[in-house]
């Protein structure tokens, strides 16, 4: 195929994309560049320009990048503590990762993020400070993927106008998404990561189409504060850590911030087998190991060791929410 035909196909793609963007000039230009680079990557990999344009069809964006960002969300009950618990160099950030068979192609991952966000509009937001509480505000902007350069779960700058409560990173064959816990919990984060990787694989041509749940329109229930609907079932958290004195552990806190990185390799099958032999769940077995480790790290014979464990309330209260919806057990 001639260079002129390739350029013509690319021009049609970018023209169609431009009609679906109502962004500031700089961000519009960056997003057009994202799609151009993704198309060039696909054609370099041997894909015909017409098929590359079909995979990157801007119609899949819907009107997401044309919308007016006039919606805001109060924090759900579980999320209110996270802004208040932030300190210099620490905030409640968690990470989920997926490992691919080959190295990540950044151009396609960036395009995959653009296609994934319309399915998760609650994630296209920023954190704002209100008179009494923080809240989450919708934004219409370009979100960017980046190479991984920092320690996992580093604090996020949520103070600026271009801030966001999640980030997408890549390193070799790993795709990682980190979330400020104010935005979502493990269930919502896993749904987002699964959709993102699925979209990436579709762009690569490894799968023909994405699952129906991702293609469907966002469900309003996904952004609900489920605690309000199930207040009676969730009840009140019990007791916290107040009461008897706690055991003091030996040693000093590590200086690495936000965390020291330790890697453990476990055989999931063997772990489940060990739990069954003790008539316990995997969670209960690991908590028992942690309790024994805490005892071993203490010189004191008296005092309580209590561990608070988040429980996914979706197992007990039927909700599709992608926001934080745990209760804690101890």
Model region roles, listed by residue range:
Residues 1-134, 140-167, 178, 263, ...:
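Acyl-thioester-dependent acyl-group transfer interface
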Residues 2, 28-53, 174, 183-191, ...:
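Non-catalytic, low-complexity flexible loops and terminal extensions
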Residues 121, 184, 197-204, 276-279, ...:
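Hydrophobic/aromatic-lined pockets within catalytic cores
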Residues 105-119, 189-199, 271, 282-294:
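Structural preference for long, well-ordered alpha-helical segments in enzyme cores
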Residues 175-177, 182-183, 271-285, 293:
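Conserved catalytic-core segments centered on acid/base and nucleophilic motifs
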């Amino acid at each position: 195929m001639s260079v002129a035909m390739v350029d013509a196909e690319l021009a049609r793609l970018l023209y169609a994309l431009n009609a679906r963007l109502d962004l500031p000039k700089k961000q519009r230009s960056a997003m057009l560049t994202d799609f151009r680079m993704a198309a060039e990557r696909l054609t370099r990999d041997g894909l015909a320009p017409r098929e590359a344009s079909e995979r990157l069809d801007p119609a899949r964006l819907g009107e997401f990048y044309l919308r007016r960002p006039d919606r805001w969300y109060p924090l759900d009950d579980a999320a209110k503590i996270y802004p208040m618990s932030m300190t210099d160099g620490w905030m409640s950030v968690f990470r989920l990762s997926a490992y691919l068979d080959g190295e990540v192609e950044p151009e396609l991952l960036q395009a995959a993020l653009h296609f994934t966000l319309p399915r998760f509009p609650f994630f296209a937001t920023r954190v704002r400070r209100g008179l009494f509480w923080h809240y989450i505000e919708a934004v219409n902007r370009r979100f960017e993927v980046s190479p991984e350069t920092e320690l996992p779960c580093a604090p996020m700058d949520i103070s600026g106008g271009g801030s966001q409560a999640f980030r997408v990173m890549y390193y070799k064959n790993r795709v990682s998404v980190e979330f400020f816990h104010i935005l979502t919990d493990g269930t919502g984060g896993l749904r987002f990561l699964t959709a993102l990787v699925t979209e990436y694989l579709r762009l690569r041509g490894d799968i023909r189409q994405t699952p129906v749940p991702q293609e469907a329109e966002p469900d309003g229930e996904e952004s609900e504060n489920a605690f309000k609907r199930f207040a009676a079932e969730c009840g009140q958290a019990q007791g916290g850590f107040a009461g008897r004195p706690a055991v003091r552990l030996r040693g000093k806190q590590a200086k690495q911030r936000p965390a020291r990185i330790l890697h453990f390799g476990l055989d999931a099958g063997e772990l489940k087998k060990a739990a069954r032999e003790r008539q316990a769940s995997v969670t209960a077995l690991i908590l028992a190991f942690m309790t024994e480790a805490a005892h071993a790290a203490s010189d004191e014979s008296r005092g309580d060791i209590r561990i608070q464990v988040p429980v996914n309330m979706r197992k007990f209260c039927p909700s599709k929410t992608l926001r934080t919806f745990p209760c804690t057990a101890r």
